[in-house]
Amino acid sequence: MNAAVISPKRLLESWRTHRLLILTVVFLIFGILSPLIAKLMPELLKGGLGGIKVAVPKPTSLDAWTQYYKNITQMGIYVFALMLGGCVSQEIQQGTLVNLVTKGLPRWTVIVGKAIVGMLLWIWITSLAFLVTWAYTAYYFPDTRSPHVVLAFLPLLVFGLFFLSLIVFGSTLATNNYGGLLLTIVVMALLYLAQMVKSWQHANPVALIGDNMKILVNSDALTKLMPAMVIAVVAAVVLFFAAIKLLDRKKL
């Protein structure tokens, strides 16, 4: 039994535990709401000012995409972490890995299986929200102010690999679901603090979810993020490898 065999079982497990369904619904809502909120925001602002006349700029496609990236990076990634936070620790607690290991399953395939399924989930939910936002944005705001929507989306996918590796590593290291989630939040907080250092900004994985709007209007901005993308991928490989080593030493 190897990772290629175990991955379909992990996908089925995600469906049975409603993890896939919950993530799909949440991110679908993000996709629908992002352009809708941008469309309604001027009216909401006018209504909240109690009749005071204020010049509110007409919303554009940029407002819809700004809302999309805010929803994904400020809420979506943490919903994802919450759903997958116990992906390893929970199975160790429940003893479900014991039978697999006694049947000859190498422990490394558990981590690789989690990585494959987790990345498939990330690609699915972010792409779903992206496509829905794109469709509604094209309908509500048929302008040309957002020429590079696909390029702006690519760093988000790469960040997902890094973020997933952090979740899997934390879940393997921790003895419970909350420990792994806490580690993920702490590391993210440290990365956000590091982003305040100007010389580190283009090498920080957090930049992959912070500079998307710059890429949206100027494709050259993607080149500046190459160091962050490389570091994110390398860090992900290191964290997955570390998770494998940790699981090898864990008592199941």
Describe each region flagged by the PLM.
Residues C87-M119:
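Helix-loop-helix units of permease transmembrane domains in multi-pass membrane transporters
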Residues E13, Q90, K103, W134, ...:
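Transmembrane helix-loop junction
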Residues F27-C87, V112-T184, Y192, K214-V233:
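Secretory targeting signals
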Residues A64, L84, G95-T96, L208:
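Hydrophobic alpha-helical segments typical of transmembrane helices
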Residues M1-L28:
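Aromatic- and glycine-rich beta-strand/loop motifs that create alpha-glucan
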Residues V5, S199-N218:
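Short hydrophobic, aromatic-rich alpha-helical segments embedded in or entering the lipid bilayer
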Residues V234-L252:
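Junction motif at the cytosolic side of a transmembrane helix
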